[in-house]
């Protein structure tokens, strides 16, 4: 006999999510398997990532799964979507979302414009390979990497400031999941800077190329600032819209839209 699960479908600039309130999970579920099932485009609901959230005192805990069932440490677009959903349900405009050990301070400016204080980023973490190793990788696969830098936004990102064709982005994104280079995989950002705008495409670990990536925007913005390619504020441009990024006292602030697509019932067999 199948069970029923209430869900919400949302997206941030085309980066889409199935979102479930934990209190609606009345049975016992393997969440990794549930994520894989619901994320299927033709046999499920379809999404880039699967989100479970739960209210805890004055904040909301968010747990993120990729379409392959693996867990993710952060998602900027999902954070804006969850903030909007909570605002629509409760009227709250200032919302704290907790993901792992990171607290994200969200403010709903209006229904279509949400800002998120992502906090600081790091350019020196144990997971980051040496620059020489990255260049060895590039030479092995004959990839022209003009400028690369690793950045930790709460999840790992490699930012490549080099224009690559879509088919090459897929190849590079997949090849960079080499365990010898990045033990837990890495999100790969392909960034092109023009007129203080970053035109961005992101290969997300566990999901592949997506239409937008909020944490990728944060990481690429921070990397661009560090390398002197851009200044704050800056627009990060994706296929279906933009995010406005700025730096305040060492914190990265992301501002942009979130869209409610549907609410429904999923029949879990």
UniProtKB/Swiss-Prot annotation:
Q: Where does substrate bind?
A: 15, 49, 66, 76-77, 155, 187, 204-205, 214-215
Involved pathway(s): Amino-acid biosynthesis; L-lysine biosynthesis via DAP pathway; DL-2,6-diaminopimelate from LL-2,6-diaminopimelate: step 1/1
Subcellular location as annotated: Cytoplasm
Keyword Iron carried by entry: no
Its signal peptide is none
Q: Which UniProt keywords apply?
A: Amino-acid biosynthesis, Cytoplasm, Isomerase, Lysine biosynthesis
Enzyme Commission number, as recorded: 5.1.1.7
Q: Which top class of enzyme applies to this chain?
A: isomerase
Reactions catalysed, semicolon-separated, are: (2S,6S)-2,6-diaminopimelate = meso-2,6-diaminopimelate
- Which InterPro entries does this one have? DAP_epimerase_AS, DAP_epimerase_DapF
| Gene Ontology, cellular component aspect | cytosol
Which Gene Ontology terms cover its molecular function?
A: diaminopimelate epimerase activity
Q: Is the Disulfide bond keyword given for this protein?
A: no
Where along the sequence does the record put site: Could be important to modulate the pK values of the two catalytic cysteine residues?
A: 157, 204
* Domain of life of the native organism: Bacteria
Q: What is its main location?
A: cytoplasm
Gene Ontology biological process terms in this record:
lysine biosynthetic process via diaminopimelate
UniProt-annotated catalytic positions = 75 (proton donor), 213 (proton acceptor)
| HAMAP family to which the protein is assigned, alphabetical | DAP_epimerase (MF_00197)
Q: Which family does the record claim for this protein? A: Belongs to the diaminopimelate epimerase family.
Q: How does it assemble?
A: Homodimer.
Stated role? Catalyzes the stereoinversion of LL-2,6-diaminopimelate (L,L-DAP) to meso-diaminopimelate (meso-DAP), a precursor of L-lysine and an essential component of the bacterial peptidoglycan.
Indicate what this protein is called per its UniProt record.
Diaminopimelate epimerase
This chain is encoded by the gene named: dapF
């Amino acid at each position: 006999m199948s069970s029923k699960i209430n869900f919400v479908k949302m997206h941030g600039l085309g980066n889409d999510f199935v979102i479930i309130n934990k209190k609606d999970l009345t049975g016992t579920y393997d969440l990794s398997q549930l994520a894989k099932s619901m994320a299927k485009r033709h046999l499920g609901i379809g999404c880039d990532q699967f989100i479970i959230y739960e209210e805890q005192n004055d904040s909301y805990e968010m747990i993120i799964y990729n379409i392959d069932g693996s867990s993710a440490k952060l998602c900027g677009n999902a954070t804006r979507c969850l903030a909007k959903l909570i605002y629509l349900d409760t009227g709250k405009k200032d919302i704290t979302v907790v993901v792992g050990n990171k607290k994200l301070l969200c403010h709903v400016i209006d229904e279509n414009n949400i800002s998120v204080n992502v906090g600081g980023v790091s350019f020196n973490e144990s997971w980051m390979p040496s620059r020489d190793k990255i260049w060895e990788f590039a030479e092995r696969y004959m990839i022209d990497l003009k400028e690369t830098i690793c950045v930790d936004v709460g999840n790992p990102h490699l930012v490549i400031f080099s224009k690559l064709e879509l088919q090459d982005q897929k190849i590079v994104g997949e090849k960079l999941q080499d365990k010898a280079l990045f033990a837990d995989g890495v999100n790969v950002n392909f960034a092109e800077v023009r007129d203080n705008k970053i035109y961005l495409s992101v290969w997300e670990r566990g999901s592949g190329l997506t239409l937008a990536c909020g944490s990728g925007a944060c990481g690429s913005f921070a990397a661009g600032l560090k390398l002197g390619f851009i200044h704050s504020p800056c627009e990060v441009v994706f296929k279906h819209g933009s995010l406005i990024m700025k730096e305040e006292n060492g914190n990265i602030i992301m501002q942009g839209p979130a869209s409610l697509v549907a609410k429904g019932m999923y029949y879990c067999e």
